[in-house]
């Protein structure tokens, strides 16, 4: 009564297979599956705390900054001399 019977579903499935073909249906199913998998992965990644840092926010004392700066300038001057 008002519902779709198994025979009607089978007829609709046969018509869909005839219209689209099995290869295209298989491809669409694979695309749908990968989209659902990607969505689930994104949702699970959102729940985990972010351990990765986007930038270096650790405080450094002045001596560390001077040492790093002098090492960078030394490397740059060596590179400039090699190119010349």
Curated annotation (Swiss-Prot):
It comes from the Bacteria. Keywords: Cell inner membrane, Cell membrane, Membrane, Protein transport, Translocation, Transmembrane, Transmembrane helix, Transport. The chain crosses the membrane at residues 1-21. It holds the Pfam family TatA_B_E. Gene3D superfamilies: 1.20.5.3310. The keyword Transmembrane helix applies. InterPro entries: TatA/B/E, TatA/E. GO terms for molecular function: protein transmembrane transporter activity. Residues 40-84 are annotated as: Disordered. It is a single-pass membrane protein. One of its GO terms (cellular component) is TAT protein transport complex. PANTHER family: SEC-INDEPENDENT PROTEIN TRANSLOCASE PROTEIN TATA. Part of the twin-arginine translocation (Tat) system that transports large folded proteins containing a characteristic twin-arginine motif in their signal peptide across membranes. TatA could form the protein-conducting channel of the Tat system. Belongs to the TatA/E family. The Tat system comprises two distinct complexes: a TatABC complex, containing multiple copies of TatA, TatB and TatC subunits, and a separate TatA complex, containing only TatA subunits. Substrates initially bind to the TatABC complex, which probably triggers association of the separate TatA complex to form the active translocon. This is Sec-independent protein translocase protein TatA. The gene is tatA.
């Amino acid at each position: 009564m008002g519902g779709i019977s198994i025979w009607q579903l089978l007829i609709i499935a046969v018509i869909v297979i005839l219209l689209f073909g099995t290869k295209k249906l298989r491809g669409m199913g694979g695309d749908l599956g990968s989209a659902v998998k990607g969505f689930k992965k994104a949702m699970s990644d959102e729940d985990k705390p972010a351990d990765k840092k986007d930038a270096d926010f650790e405080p450094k004392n002045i001596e560390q900054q001077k040492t790093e700066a002098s090492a960078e300038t030394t490397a740059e001057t060596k590179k400039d001399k090699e190119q010349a």
